[in-house]
Every structure is written in structure tokens, then in C-alpha cells.
Amino acid sequence: MNLEGTHVAMITPFNNDNTINEEKYREFIDFLIEGGVDGILAAGTTGESATLTLEEHQKVIDIMVDQANGRVTTIAGAGSNATSEALDLVNYSKDAGADVALVITPYYNKPQQSGLYNHFKLLNDQCDMPIIAYNVPSRTGVDLSVDNIINLAKLDNIVAIKEANPDLNKLAHVFSRLNSENLLDDFTVLSGNDSLTLPMISQGSKGVISVVANIMPNKTSTMVNNALNGNYDEARTLSNELFNLMDVLFIEASPAPTKRALNLMGMDVGGLRMPINEICDENEVILKEILKENNLI
């Protein structure tokens, strides 16, 4: 399937009582689509999936699919450190009408490489749905090896990887292997780090699952589209202009800075689920300055 372009790892708006704010979520989805993004992700890390109940997890997927209404690619966060739970979430995502599922590598229990492969192999065999594998060793404690990524690329339903390991040398090995084994046409590599999207596209990535696009969907999409079309001078300019914003969104635990930025912009997306706290006053001053530099407040 075509996964080129800019996909947004969406925040989840909450009411004052910390329940999901469906009205704001639908408004936010429209804001992103009108901003020119190619896809949206519900119940990812930025969407606070770790602190959503199963019912809430399913609800945000349902809202996303309904509100998008075929206008963009819908990606359902469906990962778990229990393979059986991931299987249930992928199957739910398919039944809900999502286009593709995003499945993080199992976290905390730190399976060996064979365990990681078997996790995705079971999902491949038992779920009739395209799956994006998500590799983010800084959060999970495990890193898909080059060999494992290549093996996953050979599975029919594992159609892409969101690669958030910042090691560009490793990525070069991945692309060399994908090319030599004629897998590039059927397997997509997406950036999982906004600041590395441009260099990753230059190596062969087809886009990004982005956090900064929550704030500036149009500019992020324009940067990615220029890079994909080979207009690297323009893409580089836009990437450099976006860098301080990309960086400040991780000045504290994500998605705290992103949600604070959106609230400062008047988007009224609510607070955070514990144990994530609001950002400190000192960092809010820094965040405000960068938002002002980008004419966002």
C-alpha cells in the first residue's frame, strides 16, 4: 500500500475530567487533514496510548476512522507487549475500518530477536491487515536488528517500519539490504524522528510519522513533499525552520510539550494522563518563544 508522505501521531484531547473529548478530537482531525497531511495515527505514543483503557483505545480508533471518512490514510495504534493483546487490537482495528495498524515492538519484557520476529510473524499470519512495525528502542529497551527488519519485510502483511532508532549508519545497511534483495517496492521505511526525516528520505525513506505535524501540518507536509520530489534545497530550508519546534516538543516527556503548545495556540485539547505532568514554567517560557518565532501565538 502507498504510505508515502506525512502521517501525524495525533494527541488525544481530554475533557476537564480527563475523559476523551470527542468533539475536540474530531475538530483536530479536520485541522490536520485541512493542513494537507497524508495520514493520521490514533492511539500512538503521542496519543497517550499507555494510559488509555482498552475501551478508550478502541474509541479513538473508531472516531478517527469515522471522522477521516476516507480522506486520508488511517493508522490504528495496536501494539502491546503481550502478543495476544496485540492480535486482538489489530483485529479490532481491521473491523473498525482502519487502513493499517501500527504495532510497536514488545516493550519492558525485552524479547530476544527471535521473539520479536515471532511476535510479528504471528500477527502477519493471523491478521488480514497491513501492519507497520514500530521500532523505538529508546522507549522499549529492544532494537530490531537489520537482519530482523529484512526478515519482516519478506512477510506479506508487514508493509512498513516506523524507524525511530536515530542510527543512520544502521539505516544505510537496511536500505542496502532491501535494495539487494529486491524488497524496496513492497516495503516502506518511515521516519520516527522529525529531525531526521530529511536525511532519512535522502537514504530512501518515503515519509514520516510525525509529532511536529500536530502543530504545523502544512509546513511539515510541504517539507516532506519537497524532499520526496527531489527539491532538497527547499526541503532543507523548511526542515531547518522547523527544527527548533521539533526539538522543543521533546524538552520534557512527550506529549506534554505538544499538548501545551496546542493549548497555547487556542486548540483547547485538555491536559495529560498521569504520570505525565504539565511542563515546568521554565520550559514553558522556551516553548512560548519558539511558538512566537513561528507566528503560532
Swiss-Prot record:
Pathway: Amino-acid biosynthesis; L-lysine biosynthesis via DAP pathway; (S)-tetrahydrodipicolinate from L-aspartate: step 3/4. The record marks T45, Y108 as: Part of a proton relay during catalysis. Keywords: Amino-acid biosynthesis, Cytoplasm, Diaminopimelate biosynthesis, Lyase, Lysine biosynthesis, Schiff base. The active site is at Y134, K162. SUPFAM superfamilies: Aldolase. It is found in: Cytoplasm. GO terms for cellular component: cytoplasm. GO terms for molecular function: 2-dehydro-3-deoxy-phosphogluconate aldolase activity; 4-hydroxy-tetrahydrodipicolinate synthase activity. Its main location: cytoplasm. Its EC number is 4.3.3.7. Belongs to the DapA family. Catalyzes the condensation of (S)-aspartate-beta-semialdehyde [(S)-ASA] and pyruvate to 4-hydroxy-tetrahydrodipicolinate (HTPA). This is 4-hydroxy-tetrahydrodipicolinate synthase. It comes from Methanosphaera stadtmanae (strain ATCC 43021 / DSM 3091 / JCM 11832 / MCB-3). The lineage of its organism: Archaea, Methanobacteriati, Methanobacteriota, Methanomada group, Methanobacteria.
